[in-house]
Design a protein with these regions (language model features):
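Cytoplasmic helix-loop-helix junction between adjacent transmembrane helices
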Residues: 103-137
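Juxtamembrane intracellular "pre-TM" segments in multi-pass secondary transporters
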Residues: 1-8, 180-211
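Hydrophobic core of transmembrane alpha-helices in multi-pass small-molecule transporters
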Residues: 16, 94-109, 213, 295-310
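C-terminal ends and interior cores of transmembrane alpha-helices
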Residues: 78-91, 277-291
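Helix-to-loop junctions at the C-terminal end of transmembrane segments
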Residues: 56-69, 152, 255-267, 353-354
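Helix-loop boundary and gating motifs at the non-cytosolic
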Residues: 2-51, 206-211, 215-244
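Cytoplasmic membrane-interface "Motif A"-like loop-to-helix N-cap segments
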Residues: 65-77, 265-276
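A membrane-interface helix-boundary motif in multi-pass transporters
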Residues: 153-166, 353-370
Length: 385
């Protein structure tokens, strides 16, 4: 995999650093923002950030063709580092505007790394490469949760954002030296709307998009509302939440590489069905857990992520098997499932939270919704893989 491919090693390191930065801040963003906007307006900030991200992602393939992958990555990561520094320093509501810019920039860096993995990996070993890449970036999430819970028990949110800035500064340095003299592929010259038409005319890409959208919706609800439920409703401390989330994320490190390797030989259909079944059942079980016990919540959330880890790697492998390295516009569309989810999930949650009798009903609704993924996965045929 890495033999004679030093650029791929650099990309994996960059993926690790980016994920470390994201993991340090993702689970505290909602609590941090609520201090400036009020708890009720946090969803609105996420919606605005996501809509702006979708608008920018629409033009990214054209920007990439003009700038080249290397320069695009340096500019977007440099601006991300700057925005994180400002977030760590600002103490006024203006920090919300900087957060929105940072939110958009993170998606640009994620897109750039996705494109780089596609360029420097061979299609025949796509499952192995994607599985290992996901394991590496999710290792960063585990380590960050282990550290951030302890950090928050001693310092404030601003400290974590400053640590995230330092990580992105390192990212910029490694990107500058590690990807020098890279050669871009000949990108498709397709207009924005036409790329959407081509994407959604392909049943395999549409199916991959729908599966990933459902997974991203799951992530958004979990990222925004699980910390709130554990902290505000069940009385867990941030140190306890850090331990819970560290254990919760272990499946992403332990099983994604073997699963990716396995998918190269077997295919994705059966594993996707299994993943959605496990994620749905485990999420439904959260509705019934009302005790303040770290080990119970750690085990329950660990189970939800076993399903999510299976879905994530199989969805990515299935998608990337059906595109070529020059199809950068398709990657932009596929990755917009995350900002789309950050629009849909808070809107749905706003309606749901005004109708349900208690907060824990969100897990009952989310678990039921994940059952639809079993049907989606069952529509994959052997000829589609």
């Amino acid at each position: 995999m890495f033999k004679g491919n030093s650029k791929l090693k650099s990309i994996f390191l960059l993926g690790f650093l980016l994920s470390l930065q994201l993991a340090f801040t993702s689970y505290i963003n909602s609590s941090f923002l609520s201090g400036f906007s009020g708890e009720k307006n946090v969803a609105l900030i996420y919606i605005v950030s996501s809509l702006a991200s979708l608008a920018v992602l629409f033009f990214v393939p054209e920007i990439l063709r003009r700038m080249g992958e290397y320069k695009f990555l340096l500019v977007s990561s440099g601006l991300t580092a700057l925005s994180l520094l400002l977030i760590s320093l600002l103490r006024s509501p203006s920090v919300i505007v900087v957060f929105i810019f940072c939110f958009i920039l993170n998606y640009l860096v994620i897109f750039a790394l996705d494109e780089l993995v596609q360029i420097f990996s061979k299609n025949s070993s796509m499952g192995k490469v994607r599985g290992l890449y996901l394991s590496v970036i999710n290792l960063a999430w585990v380590l960050a949760q282990l550290i951030s819970g302890e950090t928050l028990s001693k310092w404030n949110f601003s400290t974590l954002y400053f640590i995230a800035f330092v990580i992105m500064a390192l990212f910029l340095v490694f990107a500058y030296f590690g990807l020098k003299n890279m050669v871009d592929p000949k990108y498709d010259k397709v207009l924005g709307w036409k790329s959407f038409k081509n994407f959604f005319a392909n049943k395999n890409l549409v199916r991959a998009y729908a599966i990933n959208l459902l997974l991203q919706f799951f992530y958004v609800w979990m990222v925004i509302y699980t910390p709130i439920y554990l902290y505000a409703h069940l009385g867990f401390s941030w140190r306890e939440i850090g331990v819970i989330f560290t254990i919760m994320l272990l499946p992403f490190v332990l099983i994604q590489f073997p699963l990716g390797k396995y998918s190269d030989r077997i295919g994705e259909r059966g594993m996707l069905i299994l993943g959605f079944f496990v994620a749905s059942l485990a999420t439904l079980s959260l509705f019934f857990i009302k005790r303040h016990e770290v080990w119970i919540w750690a085990l329950a959330l660990f189970s939800t992520r076993i399903g999510a880890a299976i879905i994530e790697v199989m969805s990515d492998v299935y998608f990337f098997k059906h595109i070529k390295s020059e199809n950068d516009e398709f990657i932009a569309i596929y990755r917009n499932t995350s900002p789309v989810s950050y629009v849909l999930a808070p809107l749905v949650a706003f309606l749901v939270l005004n109708l349900i009798p208690s907060f824990n009903f969100i897990f009952l609704i989310l678990g039921t919704l994940m059952l639809y993924g079993i049907y989606l996965s069952s529509t994959i045929r052997k000829s589609d893989i």
